[in-house]
């Protein structure tokens, strides 16, 4: 049985706890931490875990894996401390890995400790095919993400865009994955997953659509294998419209696979 520690007790952590209770994961949540203690207390209504008051204390528990569900800013600390305490780690706030220096640092720490960093596929499809294609040559990776205006509201306000003036599908960003994750840190983690899988930086376009009711991700990858095209329209989580249900399911599936005798997919 997988012994799990969770850092960040929000929507995804709650869905993991429910999946364990429904026997979809052969595991148990041993320890929890959130900088807002009330969130840890709320999540612990679904578990029988130890509530820790720091990341340092959580990583010292007897765990097989630590799941980061907190924020991009927390990734370096969570991953570094988990790996150095001989724990595998899952990074949900994968946007942090757009930082090349941090990526290289965590790669080395994981390698030195003979542990793994897991990056779930998140809210997109085709990651297995793209990883496989990267064995050959990939020439181009592009992502067009369309989201409801309310799902992008915080980032748009930070850019000085008045969302009340958006009355039709509007391109609010076009550029590299590196700039995309800086301007939309809570909305475009999938672009970093795509870039890691393909090993080349994705070209990103973000569209705010006032009529949209789901998050849509269109991916085109071209290379020596030909062309890969995928389109996913994700329903949001009921409890948090900024989180796609598929993103939460991807980490649940990953945890399930870690204890499965047969694993399908690359």
Curated annotation (Swiss-Prot):
Annotated keywords: NAD, NADP, Oxidoreductase, Pyridine nucleotide biosynthesis
Enzyme Commission code: 1.4.1.21
BP GO terms, sorted: NAD biosynthetic process
Active site: 217
Entry binding sites for NAD(+): 123, 189
Keyword NAD applies: yes
Reaction catalysed by this enzyme: L-aspartate + NADP(+) + H2O = oxaloacetate + NH4(+) + NADPH + H(+); L-aspartate + NAD(+) + H2O = oxaloacetate + NH4(+) + NADH + H(+)
GO molecular function: aspartate dehydrogenase activity; NAD binding; NADP binding; oxidoreductase activity, acting on the CH-NH2 group of donors, NAD or NADP as acceptor
Disulphide connectivity of cysteines: none
Pathway involvement of the protein, from the record: Cofactor biosynthesis; NAD(+) biosynthesis; iminoaspartate from L-aspartate (dehydrogenase route): step 1/1
Keyword Cell wall biogenesis/degradation: no
Gene3D superfamilies: Dihydrodipicolinate Reductase, domain 2, NAD(P)-binding Rossmann-like Domain
Family from the record: Belongs to the L-aspartate dehydrogenase family.
Entry function: Specifically catalyzes the NAD or NADP-dependent dehydrogenation of L-aspartate to iminoaspartate.
Note, other: The iminoaspartate product is unstable in aqueous solution and can decompose to oxaloacetate and ammonia.
PANTHER family, alphabetized: ASPARTATE DEHYDROGENASE DOMAIN-CONTAINING PROTEIN, L-ASPARTATE DEHYDROGENASE-RELATED
Protein name (database record): L-aspartate dehydrogenase
Organism: Methanococcus aeolicus (strain ATCC BAA-1280 / DSM 17508 / OCM 812 / Nankai-3)
Underlying gene: nadX
């Amino acid at each position: 049985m997988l012994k799990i520690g969770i850092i960040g007790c929000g929507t995804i952590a709650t869905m993991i706890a429910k999946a364990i209770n429904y026997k979809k994961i052969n595991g148990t949540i041993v320890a929890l931490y959130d900088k807002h203690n009330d969130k840890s207390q709320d999540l612990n209504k679904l578990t029988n875990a130890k509530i820790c008051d720091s990341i340092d204390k959580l990583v010292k528990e007897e765990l097989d894996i630590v799941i980061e569900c907190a924020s991009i800013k927390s990734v370096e600390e969570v991953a570094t401390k988990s790996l150095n305490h001989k724990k595998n780690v899952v990074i949900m706030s994968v946007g942090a890995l757009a930082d090349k220096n941090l990526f290289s640092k965590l790669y080395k720490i994981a390698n030195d400790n003979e542990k793994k960093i897991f990056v779930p596929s998140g809210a997109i499809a085709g990651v297995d095919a793209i990883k496989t294609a990267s064995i050959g040559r990939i020439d181009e990776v592009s992502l067009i993400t369309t989201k409801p205006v309310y799902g992008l509201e915080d980032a748009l306000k930070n850019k000085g865009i008045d969302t009340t003036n958006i009355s039709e599908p509007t391109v609010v960003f076009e550029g590299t994955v590196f700039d995309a994750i800086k301007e939309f840190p809570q909305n475009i983690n999938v672009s970093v997953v795509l870039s890691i899988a393909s090993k080349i930086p994705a070209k990103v376009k973000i569209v705010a659509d006032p009529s949209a009711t789901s998050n849509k991700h269109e991916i085109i990858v071209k290379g020596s294998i030909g062309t890969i095209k995928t389109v996913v329209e994700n329903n949001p989580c009921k409890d948090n419209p900024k989180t796609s249900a598929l993103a939460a399911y991807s980490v649940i599936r990953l945890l399930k696979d870690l204890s499965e005798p047969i694993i399908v997919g690359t």
